[in-house]
């Protein structure tokens, strides 16, 4: 019987070491230790330095073996202790949103008497205030008016009432000038009516920044341009559904 037990142990040891770790010692008294000491030929023994595991660590070894044999989804069910992973809170989304960028809003007007380029940027700070930035580059003569209006403002020509309309529309917002810079000079270029001649025209370049508060969600830019040979009225509104988390429903 001792030879059969030794063969079984070596066979199992050669195939899987974890099975040996999970084996329990025989019950006390099953073999007589004094009888073994008096044997003439010593019995080959398995080294206990590698194979012996204390009773406290046996469940861990058995669980490791079960974990190798069980599907991945049942490993924590066998161990009985699900992992306590801390829930990661989602990162807070920033409230600052760019309504208009320098490349999103621009107006380029070219006439015989004027060459005008206006670019703008509007940034919503998410706390009821927003910043307005405009750049103006004009060569020639002409009158242009740039204002911030709600989406309900009609696009129409009222040259004789332009001053009244702009004064009324300016009360919709509470704005204050943050920064302004204006540069004026003269620029020479080929005449439009006769390219063989050189004409000198007025050149103006300005930049301005306002800080405003909005009583409504949508902020539109209203441009009105008047000259001797050209008139233009334009209203530009951002895509609110793209910049906002909630859809916009127009009213009024």
From Swiss-Prot:
PTM annotation, UniProt: May be proteolytically processed at the boundary between the N-terminal non-conserved and the central conserved domain in neuron-like cells.
Keyword set, alphabetical order: Glycoprotein, Secreted, Signal
Main location: secreted
Renumbered residue ranges of the record's region IV (linker domain): 158-166
Region (Disordered): 27-59
Species assigned in the record: Rattus norvegicus (Rat)
Protein name, UniProt field: Neurexophilin-3
Top-level division of the source organism's lineage: Eukaryota
Family indicated by similarity: Belongs to the neurexophilin family.
Region (III): 76-157
Spans annotated as II: 23-75
UniProt biased composition (Basic residues): 45-55
Keyword DNA repair attached: no
GO molecular function term, any single one: signaling receptor binding
Subcellular compartments: Secreted
Expressed in which tissues: Brain. Detected in several other tissues.
Taxonomic lineage of the native organism: Eukaryota, Metazoa, Chordata, Craniata, Vertebrata
Signal peptide: 1-22
GO cellular component terms, A-Z: extracellular region
Chain segments carrying region V (Cys-rich): 167-252
Function: May be signaling molecules that resemble neuropeptides. Ligand for alpha-neurexins.
InterPro entries membership: Nxph, NXPH/NXPE
Keyword Metal-binding: no
Positions bearing carbohydrate: 62, 127, 137, 143
């Amino acid at each position: 019987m001792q030879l059969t037990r030794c063969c079984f142990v070596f066979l199992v040891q050669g195939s899987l070491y974890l099975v040996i770790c999970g084996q329990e010692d025989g019950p006390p008294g099953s073999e007589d230790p004094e009888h073994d000491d008096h044997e003439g030929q010593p019995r080959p023994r398995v080294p206990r330095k590698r194979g012996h595991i204390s009773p406290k660590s046996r469940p861990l070894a058995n669980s490791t073996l079960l974990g190798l044999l069980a599907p991945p989804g049942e490993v924590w069910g066998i161990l009985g202790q699900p992992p306590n992973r801390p829930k990661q809170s989602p990162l807070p989304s920033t409230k600052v949103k760019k309504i208009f960028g320098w490349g999103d809003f621009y107006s380029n007007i070219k006439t015989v008497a004027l060459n005008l380029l206006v670019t703008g940027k509007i940034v919503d700070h998410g706390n009821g205030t927003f910043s307005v930035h405009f750049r103006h580059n004009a060569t020639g003569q002409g009158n242009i008016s740039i204002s911030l209006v709600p989406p309900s403002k009609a696009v129409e020509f009222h040259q004789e009432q332009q001053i009244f309309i702009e004064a009324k529309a300016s009360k919709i917002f509470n704005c204050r000038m943050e920064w302004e810079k204006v540069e004026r000079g003269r620029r020479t270029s080929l005449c439009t009516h006769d390219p063989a001649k050189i004409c000198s025209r007025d050149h103006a370049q300005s930049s301005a920044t306002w800080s405003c508060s909005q009583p409504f969600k949508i902020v539109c830019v209203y441009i009105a341009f008047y000259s001797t040979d050209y008139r233009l009225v334009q209203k530009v509104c951002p895509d609110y559904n793209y910049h906002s988390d909630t859809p916009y429903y127009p009213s009024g």
